[in-house]
Regions:
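A short C-terminal helix-loop "cap" of Rossmann-like NAD(P)-dependent dehydrogenase/epimerase domains
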Residues: 45, 71-75, 252-259, 292-294
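N-terminal secretory signal peptides
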Residues: 1-11, 16-36
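N-terminal (or domain-start) structured segment
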Residues: 38-128, 172-176, 188-215, 220-224, ...
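C-terminal lobe and pocket-closing loops
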Residues: 137, 219-287, 319
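Hinge/capping helix and adjacent helix->loop/strand transition within the periplasmic-binding protein
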Residues: 94-103, 117-197, 201, 248, ...
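An extracytoplasmic/periplasmic, membrane-proximal ligand-sensing/linker region
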Residues: 45-47, 185, 272-329
């Protein structure tokens, strides 16, 4: 995130909250159809069920825990619900089939739902979920255990051509999987993959020598820097959480970056006024500088996204994913 973005975040948040409430005023009458109880009930009148699709300890879990008390200050109390399996597909299915009353939401790491849609293994489309608020756009890091004989990305490449190297993802058919697929395809690297449900399970496998390397987010990696060594960043720019780790581009390897977009999303057909309430609560929560400080201490650097921005980015990612459909089944 640029310095200017950080300076302007209050203006962004005011605009995001205002836009959300404006959308509610324009669309609430049309959206609030029977049952009439939804129109009359104060929202939220009870805890929101917040679905987390990766194991505790990873960045999706960590960021949700940091955000929770600030949302509660805005009148939105949440309880975390860990729904693991199939790279988030089990969790998305639960969200998709939930009652459309706004009492269930999920942290998404796009392009997860778009991948499910492209490979045809889910009964939903990415565009059917309703984006609430986004807070992060980050790339990936490739890591090995601290004392691994592989200490550079070039050594990783060389090792892949000598023997069977195994790399862990943080979810089958998830965005970490597709980024590794891009590495395999575009650099012609014949490594194998093992899939874990989040970095909380992938990192122990690396440190225990059960896999040679893993791909995961820079924030969770920074929290494990004493036990891990980082080979490269997949994005176009270095990550603030791991400022000393070079990008693949710097190392003269050209690979399509598949960035992660983190945002909260809701069940399809939730009334617009309820989406506006949640969006406004998130926007106001992110006005608190203490939240930003806690995120940075955890190695998570924020880039705030409106609903429209999230929807546009997800649509563009869906087009890129089509290139790797054959390796994600």
């Amino acid at each position: 995130m640029t310095g200017q973005s950080r300076i302007d975040r209050r203006g962004f948040l005011r605009n995001a909250g205002g836009a959300a409430l404006g959308a509610a005023a324009a669309g609430s009458i049309a959206q609030l159809t029977p049952p009439s109880a939804l129109a009359q009930e104060k929202f939220p009148a009870r805890d929101i069920n917040w679905i987390i699709y990766q194991a505790p300890g990873g960045s999706i879990d960590t960021t949700a825990r940091i955000i929770q008390p600030y949302l509660e200050k805005q009148g939105v109390k949440t309880s975390l619900d860990y729904v693991l399996g199939a790279g988030g597909r089990v969790a998305r299915t639960k969200l998709h089939t939930a009652r459309p009353d706004g009492y269930v939401m999920m942290t998404e790491s796009a392009p997860g739902a778009a991948i499910d849609e492209v490979i045809g293994r889910a009964g939903y489309k990415a565009s059917e979920f309703i984006a609430i608020f986004g807070w992060s756009v980050v790339s990936w890091q490739l890591c090995v255990k601290k004392d691994s004989p592989i200490q550079t990305f070039q050594q990783f490449v060389d090792e892949c051509h000598k023997r069977r190297v195994v790399v862990g993802t943080i979810g089958r058919s998830g965005s970490s999987h597709i980024q590794l697929a891009a590495l395999q395809k575009e650099l012609n690297l014949p490594f194998g993959m093992v899939h874990f449900e989040g970095s909380g399970k992938a990192y122990p496998a690396v440190m225990g020598g059960h896999v040679d390397a893993a791909i995961s987010g820079p924030g969770s990696g920074s929290r494990m820097h004493e036990s891990l060594h980082f080979l490269a960043i997949t994005g176009e720019e270095r990550e603030k959480a791991l400022p000393d780790v070079p990008t693949l581009t710097e190392l003269r390897f050209r690979v399509t970056p598949i960035d992660q977009i983190w945002y909260a999303m809701a069940t399809p057909k939730v009334p617009e006024d309820r989406i506006a309430t949640l969006s406004s609560a998130f926007a106001k929560a992110f006005e608190d500088k203490m939240l930003w400080e806690q995120m940075q201490k955890a190695g998570e650097y924020l880039k705030l996204l409106t609903r429209a921005q999230v929807e546009d980015m997800v649509a563009k990612q869906t087009e890129v994913i089509e290139k790797y459909k054959d390796v994600l089944g």
